[in-house]
Every structure is written in C-alpha cells, then in structure tokens.
Amino acid sequence: MLPKSSLKETQQALANAIRLGNADPLNGYAASRLAVYTRLVRNNAFGFIDRCFVEAPLHIEPEYWKNAKENFVQNGNAHSPYFQDIAGEFLLFCQEKEIFDTNILALMDFENTQLLAEVSLAKVPEKFEWNRHSVMQLSGAAYLKSYDVDFLSSDFKQFDDTPIQAIIWRDSDFRIQQQILSELDYWLLSYLQEQPNSLENVLSALNTMVEDSTSIIPLLEQVWMKWVTSEVIYPEQR
C-alpha cells in the first residue's frame, strides 16, 4: 500500500493530468486509461453545461464557447460535489473571469435560473383553497430577477438596451415559465417573498404607502389573481 502522502500526491497528479487533458503515462497509469478519464470528465461537464445553456451559445462563436468550457475544466474550482451544480459553477467561473460580455452573462444567469427552478425541491400544489385572509407566499420554485438588458421580448434573438424585471417559475405540471414583470407585479411578488401575507393585509399596507390607493387597489387585486392562477403564489407552507 502506498504511504498516505504518496497516495495524496498521486491522486493530485492524476486530477491535474485529467484537468489538463494530459494523456502521458503517470505513476503506472497507462496513457489509454488517462485518455478515458479525460474524455469522461469533459463529456460529463460539457454535457451538463450545454443542456443548461441553450440560448447563450447561439450568440457566441462556437470555438469561443468550446474554449470557455475547456478553460473551466482546466482552471475552475468546484464548490459543489453535485453534477446538477456544474452549470452554476461554470456561470460563476465565467462571471469571475469576465469571459463573456455582460449581455451574454445576463442571459446565462437567466438560463441557469431556469435550471434552478426545474430542480428546486419546492412542492408546488396543484390545487388549493384560499380567500382574502389566507396567508400566501411566493412559490419556492419561483425566482425574481433584474437585468440591465432585455432578451425576453425578442424571444432570445437579440439584446435590447432596456432594463427588465422578470420571474422564472415552475408550475405544478413541472413546466418552466418566465415573464417580464410590471412594477406592480415586481412589488407584490417581492413583498410576498420577504413576508408571506394575505391579500387584505397587503391592501392595508398599500394604503399606508400610497396617499390615494383607490385606483391601484383593483389593479393589485387583478395582479394577485393572475399570480394565484399561475401557481406563483399559494397558501403558506410550513
């Protein structure tokens, strides 16, 4: 059996060889075995990345995208042992290294948020009862985002220099949805994200913040109903 220090050194050397794609023999490891490990790591990492980021690569030269993934494997630091987190690790790496421009990074953040909604452990109820006094919460599978660029209005075809606020969520049928939010939408959903509450209490809070809320109240009630129907807000889960 190898001494512990020697074993650690061998493991580190093997990891470095796989990272760098170095297929030279290493401490008894045949070049063919190293090549298999190297391909396996890249196939898994690249596969998870490409399944998450579908739209962003369409705005990038293929070779540049390929090089970014290789750069990540060679130089990135893993903060999570789970495969489903690889895409998020890649996004963080690209953000820290400023590998792509801010528009691309914003779109990548959006696509990664879609993945987060998909794999969220939150249970979205298909049916529920509520009334104006029911304490309601923002769905645990919903994410509020703000971006300095609009790629949603064009269905990801172009980047418009217009700030947007958006929501990405998963419904009870496990469909991932997204929508640009109005200021009233964003205010209501942000409010419920911070503190679950009833419609009556939210309306009362609105009265204390706005001098004359008469015209806003019916709009807020419509917005509330819209998000209840969309399964974005539902009775608080404890």
Curated annotation (Swiss-Prot):
Matches recorded under Pfam families: DUF2063, NGO1945_C
Cite the InterPro entries for this sequence.
DUF2063, DUF2063_N_sf, NGO1945-like_C
| Highest taxon of source | Bacteria
The protein depicted here goes by the name Uncharacterized protein HI_1599
